[in-house]
Amino acid sequence: MPKLIPHKNMDIIRKNAARCKAHGIILPTISQQMNPHNIPLELQNRIKEIGLWDLNPLNLFRITWKNDMETGLFGAPNYFEIPPEISGVRARIVGLVGKYFPTGAHKVGAAYGCLLPLLVSGAFDPETQKSVWPSTGNYCRGGAFDAALLDCPAVAVLPEGMSEERFAWLREIGAEIILTPGSESNVKEIYDKCEELSHDPHYTILNHFEEPGNSFWNYQVTGSALWETFQHIKKPANRLSAFVSATGSAGTIAAGDYLKKMSPHTMITAAEAMECPTMLNNGFGEHR
């Protein structure tokens, strides 16, 4: 995996640290997002007083699979199990629940994993640059939300065929929106626009297909949450057979590598939308 922080700019690092201090922003470590029980109690007491989607920097600590919606604090990873009466198979099928992340999707974590290294290394200067979040879905929402919490200007680049509710929410949290032709499968048009923007030094493109922080965050945070869930629910005769991930930017599926480290015989399986089976047969089309 490429280095998350290949080089440092100490002048911008100092500026970013001063900016965070001035706005009361504390950056959670990846370890704290893996194990939020290790967050200092003083911060936990403040966190439980705010809403999950509030534009409060403390919600950076809620970028975890372990949000407890009853207490406002943290517990075990949120999961569900499909009973054999519904699945029709004897194998136990368990899924993690992502709706209890801020923004309702774990892509907010992938976005944090991409932006955090740039901030702490001085590769991104929010005083002079805008963070650009290209996506057909939840990644640009997560990135814009993270940027709002971190007092960083955000630009969401997404297809014009997405829902008006999505556009309205992005505007509400202060993101600039650039629309490209098409809908879910029109990824090329998004990155054509990003290529155009990349020639302007005032834009920093956070492409989750390229940023190693996407896979790194999912390997550490999603992978450990999956393993912890398996350890919690397994019975003596159970073994971890397979991990299934719907694919897009190949971020979430990196959690499978964590599981293979813990249980080498685990299979990693990629799922694709039937209307757009890109890997299976170069499929292209709109999907839900």
What annotation goes with each model-predicted range?
Residues M1-R288:
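PLP-dependent amino-acid enzyme catalytic core
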